[in-house]
């Protein structure tokens, strides 16, 4: 039976060999840390689409483990809710992220990308994460929400602490991470409370003003839900894209043949981004709790036990993807689940796709001599979000 430490730096740097061992030897694996690990595509999709696997108990599960009350907003956003509340909250913001609306943002996204590359070109090198992958989606989501982009340094630290808290259920009870994550949520809630007060007095044509209007219209959205939704949109609105651009660029630079193919075939970019999402996706796992006993792969998962469907493992499952460890930008029938599946499918997927396509396409065209400065870039210590701390490149 294969065992693994989910927070081991070596595993986090390259989890895929471990995923393959688990999938082969113990695909429904019960960890000594008291949670279930699913690594087969079929099982992961089954859980994500099964209404018996729910999310609302997760906040209380973590709070009980650490003996702390859930911080403000935890359990109140659509990410943490089950129907009917999930349906109501998602409906309030879904119109802002439709493919049609996102297509209207292409020109602005291209403008931001061109500006960031122009700034880096003179230097001949950059940290691709800090100077390109991060500022692009932050600029875009700030403009959509109506958040002053000059405040991004303030919420960058909060965002990092909040996302570190996503792995709280895996940490020892003495860990300070949940408390730090809670403090960041408090700070970000206070920040948005101030912005909400400003927009109540002077509404604008931004998403924040639209959410406030919905809240003021009746019982569609409470103030606590409004603040939780703002935090979710700001954090999730850039984290996925940062990691898509960073992981995707690294994969291309490590596969020069595929990089050359992309440069020679610009029309390949949409297919390329889908393959990059599958090959080394920005979100590696999610979590659910069954509302009743459920049998998967011959093993019974008890009501109330934590289940972790590993998206990153499912997207390398040879039963679904032939030759799954090969990067193939022309891969067909690429039904990856990098953005999830079912009712919690990533609301911002159309935006992340367009940002990723424009960023990577422009990067490889404008910087034909782009290359890595180090062969061993450092990864963030996160099981949930797979992303690089830095990615030094030169050109």
Please place each PLM-identified region on the residue numbering.
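Cytochrome P450
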Residues: 1-395
């Amino acid at each position: 039976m294969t065992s693994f430490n989910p927070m081991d730096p070596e595993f986090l740097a390259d989890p895929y060999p471990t995923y393959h061992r688990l999938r082969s030897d113990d695909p429904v694996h019960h960890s000594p840390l008291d949670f279930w690990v699913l690594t087969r595509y079929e099982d992961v999709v089954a859980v994500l689409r099964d209404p018996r696997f729910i999310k609302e108990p997760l906040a209380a599960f973590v709070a009980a483990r650490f003996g702390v009350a859930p911080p403000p907003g935890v359990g109140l956003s659509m990410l943490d809710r089950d129907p009917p509340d999930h349906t109501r909250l998602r409906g309030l913001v879904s119109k802002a992220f439709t493919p049609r609306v996102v297509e209207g943002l292409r020109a602005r996204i291209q403008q931001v990308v061109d500006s960031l590359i122009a700034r880096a070109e003179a230097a001949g090198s950059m940290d691709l994460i800090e100077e390109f992958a991060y500022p692009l989606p932050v600029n875009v989501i700030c403009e959509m929400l109506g958040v002053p982009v000059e405040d991004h340094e303030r919420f960058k630290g909060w965002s990092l602490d909040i996302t570190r808290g996503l792995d709280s259920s895996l940490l020892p009870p003495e860990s300070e991470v949940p408390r730090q994550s809670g403090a960041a949520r408090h700070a970000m809630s206070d920040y948005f409370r101030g912005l909400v007060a400003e927009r109540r007095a002077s509404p604008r044509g931004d998403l924040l003003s639209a959410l406030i209007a919905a809240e003021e219209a009746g019982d569609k959205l409470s103030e606590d839900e409004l603040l939780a939704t703002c935090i979710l949109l700001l954090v999730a609105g850039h984290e996925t894209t940062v990691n898509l651009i960073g992981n995707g660029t690294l994969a291309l630079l490590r596969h020069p043949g595929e990089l050359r193919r992309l440069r020679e075939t610009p029309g390949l970019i949409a297919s390329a981004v889908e393959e990059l999402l599958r090959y080394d996706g920005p979100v590696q796992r999610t979590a659910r709790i069954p509302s009743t006993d459920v049998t998967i792969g011959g093993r019974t998962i008890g009501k109330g036990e934590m289940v972790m469907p590993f998206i990153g493992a499912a997207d390398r499952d040879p039963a679904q993807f032939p030759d799954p460890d090969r990067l193939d930008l022309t891969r067909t029938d690429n039904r990856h689940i990098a953005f999830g599946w079912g009712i919690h499918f990533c609301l911002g997927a159309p935006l992340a796709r367009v940002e990723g396509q424009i960023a990577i396409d422009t990067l490889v065209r404008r910087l034909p001599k782009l290359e890595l400065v180090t062969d061993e870039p450092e990864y963030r210590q996160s099981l949930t979000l797979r992303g690089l701390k830095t990615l030094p490149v030169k050109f």
